[in-house]
Design a protein with these regions (language model features):
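Small-residue-centered hinge/linker elements
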Residues: 1-36, 45-52, 57-135
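A generic structural-conservation signal
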Residues: 7, 40, 93, 142, ...
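Assembly/oligomerization interface modules of large self-assembling protein complexes
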Residues: 32, 114-172
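Glycine-rich beta-to-alpha transition loops that act as phosphate-gripper elements at the mouths
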Residues: 40-47, 146-150
Length: 172
């Protein structure tokens, strides 16, 4: 017997934007191919890449205490430019390409490298924003923090238009 819909449970704080978008796209492609409605149920968290995947749902449901949102992009690292010198190690790096060692944690940060990284982040962030707007459309509240990287409870997420209702997969 054919099921009228597919239910997906999400419990993810995020991860790679590439992998999140690929999962989103595969779900949407299968939904179109099989002519199935997709219902997404957020458990503890659907934040950042987890929320990007949740966008594959035709409807998104969350527990009142679930965490949803975090529509932003983060990159992190460490800097150790003085550490090797202190312990008497000489680091040798040879590259072909003037930018091959960009953001090397053993070299001081350079402003042009930081600007480049931020430009990539802004581009990826815009892809995420566009996905949210395309999938949630007129359901979204007009809130300046919506795309700031903040995250909210399921209850607040519903008020913001990030989720459609408060329920879990076992609700009737």
């Amino acid at each position: 017997k054919d099921a009228p819909a597919v239910a997906i449970s999400i419990n993810s704080p995020g991860g790679s934007p590439v992998q999140s978008r690929l999962i989103f796209q595969r779900i949407r492609d299968l939904a179109a191919e099989k002519n199935k409605q997709v219902l997404v149920f957020v458990e503890d968290v659907a934040a950042s890449g987890g929320y990007m995947i949740a966008l594959a749902g035709d409807e998104i449901f969350a527990d009142p205490t679930s965490i949803v949102g975090s529509i932003g992009v983060v990159s992190g690292g460490f800097g150790f430019p003085e550490m090797l010198k202190k312990i008497g190690v000489e680091r040798r790096v040879y590259t072909a390409g003037t930018n091959k060692a960009i953001l090397d944690p053993f070299q001081p940060e350079r402003e042009n490298e930081i600007e480049y990284l931020k430009s990539l982040q802004l581009e990826i962030h815009q892809v995420f924003i566009d996905m949210v707007k395309a999938r949630r459309g007129g359901k979204l509240a007009d809130d300046p923090d919506l795309f700031s990287g903040l995250f909210w409870t399921g209850t607040r997420g519903r008020a913001l238009g990030l989720v459609d209702g408060l329920a879990d997969m076992r609700s009737e």
